[in-house]
Amino acid sequence: MNNLNDPPNWNIRPNSRADGGDGSRWNYALLVPMLGLAAFRWIWSRESQKEVEKEREAYRRRTAAFQQDLEAKYHAMISENRRAVAQLSLELEKEQNRTASYREALISQGRKLVEEKKLLEQERAQVMQEKRQVQPLRSAYLSCLQREENWQRRARLLLKEFEAVLTERQNIYCSLFLPRSKRLEIEKSLLVRASVDPVAADLEMAAGLTDIFQHDTYCGDVWNTNKRQNGRLMWLYLKYWELVVELKKFKRVEEAILEK
């Protein structure tokens, strides 16, 4: 601890106490600051160490809290993702099942349509075959129907003529002034025509006329001027003959078709 460049009194000597000079004062004067500096350094180091430990502990706590927060968020995110994945898996399974059901329904519907198409084609082929078979019969039916409709028109015209004559005959029968001979002449004329006319003969009108002449005695009141209000049986026969005409038309057509 001696500085060779300094004067002797500035150096600390071990034996300065033996000289009885001011060396001790210098020693104490230098020792006190050094001790204060050492104490300050020790205190400062201790406080610094405490601050460092305190900051380190705070940092550790913050780090631990941050890590726990991250772990909690991570686990929450994992749980949420798992729930989302489970939900999506369930929805996907439902969609797959629904798609499978639709596919099966479409396949079944397609098979059904194919079967219906086959049946329709078979029915169409059968109808076409029946049409080819029926076509000649249809032509024959239309031809016979046309012929019988012509006959029906002639029969209706004949019935209209007989209706007019029978109405006149019944009017004479109910009249108090017209001669009986005129009525008998009309009756005779009607019977002759019913016998010689082929349509009237086919309807067997002669027997009906005879029945009318013998039994139709109905007349309107004395002041009646409407000839159509006289007679009852004659109107029934006229209606009956109209029905016979219609019936005979279809029976003749049927017989003609069956003969072919």
Curated annotation (Swiss-Prot):
Q: Enumerate the UniProt keywords alphabetically.
A: Coiled coil
Q: Give the disulfide map.
A: none
Q: Taxonomically, which superkingdom?
A: Eukaryota
Respond yes or no to whether keyword Coiled coil is given for this record. yes
Q: Coiled-coil region(s) at which residues?
A: 49-135
Q: Which GO terms describe its cellular component?
A: mitochondrion
Keyword Coiled coil in annotation: yes
Protein's UniProt name = Coiled-coil domain-containing protein 127
Q: What is the lineage of its organism?
A: Eukaryota, Metazoa, Chordata, Craniata, Vertebrata
Q: Gene of origin?
A: CCDC127
